[in-house]
């Protein structure tokens, strides 16, 4: 496994723990009949660390970018088939007359 993948998994685990801690904290506040204003500072720090780890993993895990060669056979455009029996040009745009007001 790649290091970026492991860091990403660890970041997701930290984010899920922060979500669980926030839900648990809100439940505790409901029991104590207090109002929820914001999550505790340790949950906010977990969110920031987890987000940073996930972003770092997302940028490093895919690998290096490959160059695109213009003469490569894989870069050819997809052309329409020569058999035009399956092409249908019957659509709502035909109802509107074309406006040809060309001024040069």
Curated annotation (Swiss-Prot):
Biological function: Mediates Mg(2+) transport.
Family annotation (InterPro entries): MMgT (IPR018937)
Domain of life: Eukaryota
Cellular localisation: Endoplasmic reticulum membrane; Golgi apparatus membrane; Early endosome membrane
Ranges of the Cytoplasmic topological domain: 1-2, 62-104
Subcellular location, principal: endoplasmic reticulum
GO cellular component terms attached to this protein's record: early endosome membrane; endoplasmic reticulum; endoplasmic reticulum membrane; Golgi membrane
Lineage: Eukaryota, Viridiplantae, Streptophyta, Embryophyta, Tracheophyta
Name the record gives this protein: Membrane magnesium transporter
Lumenal topological domain residue ranges: 24-40
TM regions (residue ranges): 3-23, 41-61
């Amino acid at each position: 496994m790649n290091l970026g993948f492991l860091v990403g998994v660890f970041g997701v685990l930290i984010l899920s723990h922060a979500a669980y801690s926030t839900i648990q904290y809100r439940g505790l506040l409901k029991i104590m009949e207090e109002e929820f204003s914001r999550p505790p500072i340790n949950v906010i720090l977990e969110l920031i660390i987890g987000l940073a780890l996930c972003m770092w993993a997302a940028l490093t895990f895919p690998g290096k970018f490959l160059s695109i060669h213009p003469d490569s056979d894989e870069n050819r455009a997809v052309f329409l088939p020569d058999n035009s029996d399956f092409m249908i040009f019957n659509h709502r745009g035909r109802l509107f007359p074309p406006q040809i007001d060309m001024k040069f």
